[in-house]
Every structure is written in C-alpha cells, then in structure tokens.
Amino acid sequence: MDGKLRADEVAVTKSILKSTFNMWMDIIDVDVVIIGAGPSGLTAAKYLAQNGVKTVVLERHLSFGGGTWGGGMGFPNIVVEKPADEILREAGIKLDEVDGEDELFTADSVEVPAKLGVAAIDAGAKILTGIVVEDLILKEDKIAGVVIQSYAIEKAGLHIDPLTISAKYVIDSTGHDASAVHTLARKNKDLGIEVPGEKSMWAEKGENSLTRNTREIFPGLYVCGMAANAYHAGYRMGAIFGGMYLSGKKCAEMILEKLENK
C-alpha cells in the first residue's frame, strides 16, 4: 500500500446520491417521526429504536442536542436529578455528584448530547439534520405524517414545494416553541387547539409537570419535553434536564404500548 488516496470527484458525487436515495426510500414510511433532536427527542428515539420501532428524528439545525450544548448561561455543565440520572448512565455519560445535594448531579454539556445522540443512532434511530417540518399530514382526523423542507430553502425564502414522510405517530419535541402543535392549531382552527405557552421559571414545578404533561394531545400527535409544558402552560426549569429525559422515555413507552396493542 503506497498510501495514495482515491479522490475522483464524480465517484464522490455518485456515492452520495446513491446512498441518499436508498436512505430516503427506506424512511419515507416509518412508525414514528420525532420533530426536534433535543434532550427529550433523542431520549424517545433511543427507547423506541431499541425496541424495534422504525424511528426518524428530524432536526432543523445541523447538530442535535437542542439547548444542551450551552449548559447554563454558557457554562459547560447541566444538572440532572434522580431518577433521570439512570437514563444518562445507560448512555455511558459521566455524572458528578453535587456536594450537599444527594439527588443532584452535574454532567458535561457537550458529552451529554454527543453520547445520547450516538446511543439513539446505535439503537437504530435515523437522525436527519437540516430538515424542517413545515406542516403535518392530517387524514380523517388523525396525524398521519409530516411535511418536510430543507431548512436552507426555508431560510432563503424560496417558494419550493415540500416532501412528506408517513408515520403512525408523530412526536413534537421542538422545545419551547411547540412548533408542530402551533402549526396544527394555526392551519386547522376548527380543531379548537390552543397553545398557551410556558409560564415563567419554577424549576421544581416545571420538572414535576413534564412527565404528567407528556401525552397524546391529538390522535397520532404526542408532545414531550418543553413542548409538553408549552402546550399545557407549565413552568420552565432552566439548566436542569432530568424532567426532559424522563418525558422522552415516557413518550416512547406510551407509543410502544399503542403499537403493541395494534
């Protein structure tokens, strides 16, 4: 071996096009589409995929993890509490005990999304970045999939028609915006859906309401993470993430139960 690298331009292009075509053909009809690759979305993806559920995660940005990367006000740590710490430990994430706080741990705000994303991918979930969900497929009073567009095309303001992905269930894990639910409410006012938005910060109340607010809010459409609190007017929490991970896990468990009973 002389160490010379092959770099034929056309071969590179052909390889990308063939691989991309095969990938899209495989994911245009799935069990679950998760909108938003933040902490709750990645957690839901991991638990769904490791149970054999065909899962696609769509993220508008070119990286997954949502707001985790920035830690608290840019300081590179987040806080997680019991029992949510077990979710991170399963993904091989190192946790440090907090002096004087028996149930609180800190974690590296870069390590957490990196390893949680890899855990979801290794479980079998497909994560696509640079894709925005601009609408939902609504058939016979049930959500049946998502309408997707390139985020670059959307940002450029170009009028180009979108494509679609069919799904048995859709999860809105878009965070504070609850963008999928907002879109459903705005475009289908006859459904009577309202999104009051989240309240101001009350960390303990917000954390404890997250799993309670995680549910199917319309046939085929679930909310988890901060989208759940935004839909139910729950409190925000700041840089403590345990409720987010527990919300994602609960959402996955609810859908798994639905799929098993079908």
Swiss-Prot record:
Ligand binding (glycine): 236
The enzyme's E.C. designation: 2.4.2.59
Residue numbers binding Fe cation: 161, 176
Biological process terms in GO annotation: thiamine biosynthetic process; thiamine diphosphate biosynthetic process; thiazole biosynthetic process
Gene Ontology MF: a single term: pentosyltransferase activity
Residues reported in the UniProt entry to bind NAD(+): 40, 59-60, 67, 133, 159-161, 179, 226
Pfam (any one): Thi4
Pathway membership, UniProt: Cofactor biosynthesis; thiamine diphosphate biosynthesis
Catalytic activity: hydrogen sulfide + glycine + NAD(+) = ADP-5-ethyl-4-methylthiazole-2-carboxylate + nicotinamide + 3 H2O + H(+)
Function per UniProt: Involved in the biosynthesis of the thiazole moiety of thiamine. Catalyzes the conversion of NAD and glycine to adenosine diphosphate 5-(2-hydroxyethyl)-4-methylthiazole-2-carboxylate (ADT), an adenylated thiazole intermediate, using free sulfide as a source of sulfur.
PANTHER family: THIAMINE THIAZOLE SYNTHASE
Family: Belongs to the THI4 family.
Subunit structure as annotated in this protein's UniProt entry: Homooctamer; tetramer of dimers.
Protein name in UniProt: Thiamine thiazole synthase
Highest classification ranks of the organism: Archaea, Methanobacteriati, Methanobacteriota, Methanomada group, Methanococci
Name of encoding gene: thi4
